């Protein structure tokens, strides 16, 4: 469960995100979409505990991220769009390091299963410098999944993946939701959002302009009936660069 209540983030006098409230239940996949600069990454970084809110509260699995950050962060995984890896650790050593960090005692049998799921078994002894951009992304996601987080935050998770890798990643994301994780997926790929997400949150200039299933959004905005998600996105945000 992810609960966001009246989250606001200011940088000086500049409002990055204003009065944002939503909930992601276990098993839900929330698509976070908006134009560049809308506040998507700021929101994800706040949910990950990297940025402190100016006001409002965030709870991960019922735990307040501000008052008990260690416990809250232990229940989430944030995979940014640029993988953060260690140059001198192999693929397997990355996972072993994460296991120690999160106290995953049963990591031994879990690591090869994750490597197989994300098609990294053949690269288990490789260093990051020997990996393609897509393989680095897969490794970052494997590290995020190792401790079986209750909340999964994904920022452009398909970056650098080939078509086979994209298909595999979609299966992985859907599987984690079925297992009960609350998932937030931020992406400019609207077809991916429409395929994977149970609900959509559209933000513009740091504010929510739509939240719900496609049917619920259309119900609140009858003028959007019969339009594609791309057309709805443009109408809601005024952004002609959607793709």
For the regions a language model picked out, list residue spans one by one.
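Conserved ABC transporter NBD signature motif
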Residues: 56-67, 71-72
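Conserved ABC ATPase "signature" region
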Residues: 96, 100-123
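Conserved ABC ATPase signature
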Residues: 127-134
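Catalytic Walker B motif of ABC-type/P-loop ATPase nucleotide-binding domains
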Residues: 152-156
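A short, surface-exposed alpha-helical micro-motif characterized by mixed small hydrophobic
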Residues: 193-195
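ABC ATPase "signature
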Residues: 211-212
